């Protein structure tokens, strides 16, 4: 069984991603965090297989979160979902091994 972590400061966005996962018949262990700091706390307690994160969040943004996860939890599959379409974000995300943007 895989464990998924959805990270976004907007609850409606987290619910939307959860709904999309459900439509894809992914109903495994799905956890949530509202920012990067909370996400790292979840990583300390749980083995996360797939990280789905927004970029623009308070306290710790998604790019910094990706950097930390890449260093501290190698092998975690990562996916960014965001309204930002700037190449600089995608380039940074790719450097941290993001699976999809």
How should these model regions be labeled?
Residues 1-3:
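Non-catalytic signal-transmission and effector/linker regions of two-component phosphorelay proteins
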Residues 6, 12, 16, 59, ...:
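N-proximal short alpha-helices
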Residues 6, 28, 79:
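Generic anion/oxyanion-binding catalytic loop in active/binding sites
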Residues 33-37:
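Conserved Asp/Asn-Gly motif in the active-site loop of CheY-like receiver
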Residues 40-101:
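CheY-like receiver
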Residues 11-31:
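Two-component/phosphorelay signaling modules centered on CheY-like receiver
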Residues 8-9, 54:
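Acidic di-acidic motifs
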